[in-house]
Amino acid sequence: MDAIIIFLILFIVGVLIGVGVYYYKEKERKKTYKIIEMEIIENLKELKPYVAPDEGREYTKEFDLVEIALSYDIEDIIVVNDEGLVIATTLKDADEVGATASSIFEYIKKLCGNIKKVVIFKEDSYLYIYPLKLYGENLYVIIESKIALDVIEEKEILKRITGVLKKYFSTITTIEQEIPEEALLSI
């Protein structure tokens, strides 16, 4: 009987030590990933001044769209709603550009009817305006690039931007689900 009790005690101690070692290694692994992530962010912060537009504009501190812009050699990405209000952007002050581009798209749409995109060549860059419908919202993606984008790149960029926007909109739908409907009606 004593042997069984000693065995059970040693077994439980062994399992607890094993679980403790496992959690310690997981904690260290997460800490390592966090350190690597912070180094990447710091490197992006160092890189941003070298690729930022020359017009005195600065990139924002959010790196989801900046990563897309850097990977495709794009200067700016601005996402606005149908009223011209900025949803997401790579620039700090993109309100004026977003509102102007969305109004240009709407004006051309009234003139020409059903259009898929608008491409404007200005001085040394291209301005692409794409309509996008996401979760019932009419959005416009405005891309400014010094190089012309081909159709395949456009689709890849829009797909990645849509993925980023889904993250933004998923948090909004989560918040709406957490708030009771009566509270929304009283507001």
Curated annotation (Swiss-Prot):
Record's keyword terms, sorted: Membrane, Transmembrane, Transmembrane helix
UniProt cross-references to SMART domains, sorted A to Z: Robl_LC7 (SM00960)
Disulfide bond positions: none
Record's subcellular location: Membrane
Cited Pfam families: Robl_LC7
Predominant subcellular localization, coarse grouping: membrane
Membrane-crossing segments per the record: 3-23
Bilayer topology: Single-pass membrane protein
Listed GO CC annotations: membrane
Protein's recorded name: Uncharacterized protein MJ0163
Gene source species: Methanocaldococcus jannaschii (strain ATCC 43067 / DSM 2661 / JAL-1 / JCM 10045 / NBRC 100440)
